[in-house]
Amino acid sequence: MKVLKLITVVALMMLFVTGCNIKTESPEQLAKIPDYDDTKKVLYDGIDQLLKPDSSMILPSNTKEVGKINKVDLNSDGIDELVVFEQKEDLSNNVSQVGFVTLSYNGEKYVLGDHFLENGESIEYANFYDLDSDGYKEVILLVKSKDKTNMHIYKVVDNEITKIYDLDASWLQNKEDFNDMKVKIGYIDGDDKLDILMLHLNNKTNEMFASVANFDGKMKIKDSVKFENVKNLSELYITLGNVASSVGNSSAAIKGIVLDIPILKDNNYITQILYMKDGKINKAFSDYDKTITKSYYIPVDDIDKDKIIEIPIVAGSTGNNKNTYSSKSSATISWYRWNGKEGADSSLIFTSQIYYNYKYNFKLFIPNNLFDKILVEQEFVGEKAV
């Protein structure tokens, strides 16, 4: 629907809001001060005046990628539109809807365009990609309604929003039992086409399927792979990028997916690498390989800046000796990268070992010839560190 209402908040053209997360991103970021800009309040106030009394702005769960208010060139004309995520609540009937509203700039003012709402309580994921390469960025939402999360895709043309796709996970047997979902979009297999990684979890059986697809108006599934004993998706982390250097005569790095998965056994995590080969999803390791198991989540990182993702493993995290792994205030972390090989030849290659002290904000590089031969501990006299 079109609403002929104009706003003259000039600041909207210059400002936009993204999510804020003060959680440590990596062992390399020992301390991080969140950014704050009080001029963003001008933007919030301007948008608030446009929303109906029973509506408010809402922040999707993937706060590192989007905010409540986003500047996006949806139609590739060089001019950014505003996409604002909103929630509408009917308290008398206990009904909640979530969705988004668009605003376009006509050269002088922002014009309130269209809005679209879905029944649901939260937006678990939101982003903007030209999935079908037609020059228009689609708006992708994961909406949670009661106990079910599903994906919806929209296109905005001439300020009108059209829903072009509701996901039907028909490739999954007993699809109705897979009620939780997570998504990541990016270049996964090196074919220069945007891929959609979809994770579906059966909360009753703790089975999860990871599926890779392309979208051209319809969802084209490339392949799926199964995981067992998955605790939940809310604590699962996805990283896309180069997962191994070139192998054999190939000069290109291997692109893939790194999944940090919370598992039921001992409330541990496993770090698994997925990659595409001959149209199929492959796992780099066995899910039961103890070398990829850790007691809590530690983000992967490109520790040596070679554009290959390294996997962190903490001293004492495997085997019977876990006493050095009990404290989150400090840790001795060994960094490894995958060798890019398959089957029995697949293994991790040691890169470096670093001691991190998060309480006192310092790190200590351990020489490679002393790898796993020394233990770094903090000494205290009373309440003071020596």
Task: Give residue spans per PLM region.
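Beta-propeller-forming repeat regions
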Residues: G19-G382
